[in-house]
A protein has these predicted regions:
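Solvent-exposed, non-transmembrane regions of integral membrane proteins
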Residues: 1-638
């Protein structure tokens, strides 16, 4: 019975992993309805989850796991989450309601487009859009509604929901004319509560697990503490920007302002990305000229744009806007540097006079101009990769021979890691200050954040786990390589309203920390496969296990915190979006490595290392593959 339950549980989980992988591909090829019909809502899919949960719990009880409180709590928490999801699937309702200003309705449309009746009426009193300061990018959408007949008035906005009689209303969309609002409606009085209880139990159990005695994690930690392996290191040279050929012209051009990337920024941002010649050539197409309307709202125009009627009534202003870019081009062509500077300084003076309320502060401009000159980590990634490869090979040789590096070598490596970490901290900090948002969205941001975590891991762990140095530098090098391919000055844009949530910050940080740790495990697996000594392979397996537990727990925490954020933002804590599906796949795949006690192959060091190398493909697909190939709601981060 015990053996049967074990095979049923792990077998069902393995089949579910394959089904979810296939479902994301089918969704891309044949559409979401087909994927839900064939996979997510199919009887087989539900049965497999039930078998995995029930058989797994029975096996744990028969194996004596209840004696280990937190280990049992981990698995029980997952079972409670599945129970809540089943209740939501069977009894929950969700859809949307479309209201025009002044309109009252007592029904909404379900996801299958059938009507559903509300036990009350809802009226839209007003709808409004807030914009980022000096930008046309929305910062929030607001619907003022009244529930009738009670007359309860509430305001719904992004990440600010309304709850009424067991129903929840979320700001989902709006009409193009700004006179209508579309609200998402969710009615799931039991499923959400059960699922949240599972999340809480899971979180408490993950924290308690690290204090639990006689676990595989504790055994691996003790083995690693007695290892003799160590690693070495070299030197860092920070990158230096090249000087411009026509320094004064480039400086004057860079100090102007431009409306670019849905925000007002120094022209230097565009200049560093495109180069001086291209910037001058496209000057008439750049939004350099702010104009205020009768209400005082400032909009930015290019010389080639259709200008407001008021400009044509002011001949001097019209001439200034239309002719200034042409004068700059002509002066550059003729080598008249003084003429170029005169026109550029005139444009800047006009900008400061007309748009003083929306242009960035001098301190923020200085920060951005510094940032764009150091944002591309080309020298840093090449250094990290070179050192990582050398130390990786050298470390493998030393492990095989059971030798240590001198302590001064490890200290030298830590100094280099510190310099890289300080550089990354400066770049991330400057970008954060300029944009006003943390490094949580976009490939450049996330890659730099992963490199930051990798170098921080070196600084924190190199004394106890010397192998962290080559592994950390390899990971930092690869992630900075990917970041450098995003352009000289990666675009800074205001965040979409739905992304302006502190839960998103914690969610992304948790996910990126887990991905960083999985990357370290993958590199450690490569070394484990390469070394000829069986004892060395076992030592490296222990290192991987010590890293694997916090990595899996961070991924689990991040995934379910993302579900809470999604539920708050748009009323659905799980939508089988390709990104969240692959995050779940990754979590399940890596969880197999933590069950060596039940799964004999994972007690074999060579198999374990090969598995961790292959498993990292799931991380790559989750982050890169989904954004580039599969799409879905999370593709905003691409």
């Amino acid at each position: 019975m015990k053996r049967t339950c074990k095979y049923l549980s792990y077998g069902a989980a393995a089949v579910l992993i394959v089904m979810m992988m296939a479902a994301t591909v089918v969704e891309k090829l044949h559409g979401t309805p087909v994927a839900f019909q064939w996979f997510y809502h199919s009887p087989l899919f539900l049965i497999l989850w039930a078998v995995a949960a029930v058989a797994g719990l029975v096996y744990l009880v028969m194996a004596g796991t209840p004696k280990r409180l937190f280990t049992m709590g981990l698995h029980l928490g997952l079972a409670v989450i599945l129970a809540g999801a089943l209740v939501t699937h069977l009894f929950g309702e969700s859809g949307e309601i479309h209201l025009r200003e002044g309109e009252t309705l007592a029904s909404f449309e379900l996801e299958d487009e059938s009507p559903a009746t509300l036990p009350f009426s809802i009226r839209l009193d007003a709808f409004a859009i807030d914009y980022h300061h000096g930008s046309r990018m929305p910062s929030d959408y607001r619907s003022d509604i009244t529930f009738l007949p009670e007359g309860t008035a509430v305001r719904i906005s992004m990440n600010n929901i309304a709850k009424y009689r067991g129903y929840r209303f979320y700001q989902a969309d709006y009409d193009e004319d700004g006179k209508g609002s579309i609200l998402a409606v969710s009615h799931d009085p039991w499923g959400v509560g059960i699922t949240y209880a599972g999340y809480l139990l899971l979180l408490l159990s993950m924290i308690g697990f690290f204090f639990q005695k006689d676990t595989v994690f504790r055994q691996a930690l003790r083995r690693v503490a007695t290892m003799t392996a160590a690693v070495a290191f070299l030197v860092l040279v920070p990158s230096v920007s090249a000087s411009a050929s026509t320094r004064d012209v480039k400086k004057a051009l860079g100090e102007m302002y431009v409306y670019y990337g849905h925000r007002v920024c120094p022209f230097d941002t565009y200049l560093q990305e495109k180069g001086l010649d291209a910037a001058v050539e496209s000057l008439d197409k750049m939004k350099l000229f702010p104009l205020a309307d009768s209400t005082g709202k400032v909009s930015w125009y290019a010389a080639a744009d259709d200008l407001p009627e008021s400009v044509y009534e002011d001949q001097d202003l019209w001439t200034f806007i239309r002719k200034s870019p042409e004068l700059v081009k002509e002066s550059v062509s003729s080598g008249d540097e003084a003429g170029v500077l005169q026109v550029l300084n005139g444009i800047k003076a006009y900008q400061e006079k007309t748009a003083s309320s929306v242009i960035p502060s001098p301190r923020k401009v200085k920060a951005e101009r510094t940032y764009i000159r150091i944002a591309r980590p080309k020298a840093q990634f090449m250094l990290c990769l070179a050192l990582g490869i050398v130390l990786f090979v050298l470390g493998g040789v030393l492990i095989t021979r059971k030798k240590k590096f001198p302590s001064w070598v490890l200290i030298a490596g830590a100094v280099i890691a510190l310099l890289i970490w300080l550089y990354l901290s400066l770049v991330i900090g400057l970008r954060w200050y300029v944009s006003g948002t943390g490094p949580y969205v976009g490939r450049y941001n996330v890659m730099m954040l992963m490199a930051w975590f990798a170098t921080l891991a070196i600084l924190l762990l190199y004394k106890r786990f010397p192998l962290i140095e080559p592994l950390g530098f390899l990971l930092a090098g690869f992630t900075m390589l990917l970041a450098s391919r995003e352009g000289v000055s990666p675009q800074i844009m205001p965040l979409m309203p739905v992304l302006q949530s502190p839960l998103l910050s914690i969610h992304v940080l948790s996910m990126m920390m887990s991905y960083t740790l999985f990357g370290l495990v993958a590199f450690n697996g490569i070394m484990g496969v390469a070394v000829p000594s069986a004892e060395a392979r076992e030592d490296l397996r222990s290192v991987s296990l010590v890293v694997m537990y916090p990595a899996v727990f961070l991924l689990t925490f991040g995934t379910f915190l993302g579900a809470v954020w999604a539920n708050i933002s748009w009323g659905s804590y799980w939508a089988w979006d390709p990104k969240e599906t692959w995050a779940l796949v990754t979590m399940l795949v890596y969880s197999f490595t933590l069950h060596g006690g039940a799964l004999k192959p994972f007690r074999n060091a060579r198999f374990f290392h090969w598995f961790t190398i292959a498993a990292f493909l799931c991380v790559l697909i989750t982050y890169f593959g989904v954004n580039l190939l599969l799409g879905g709601m999370h593709s905003y981060g691409s």
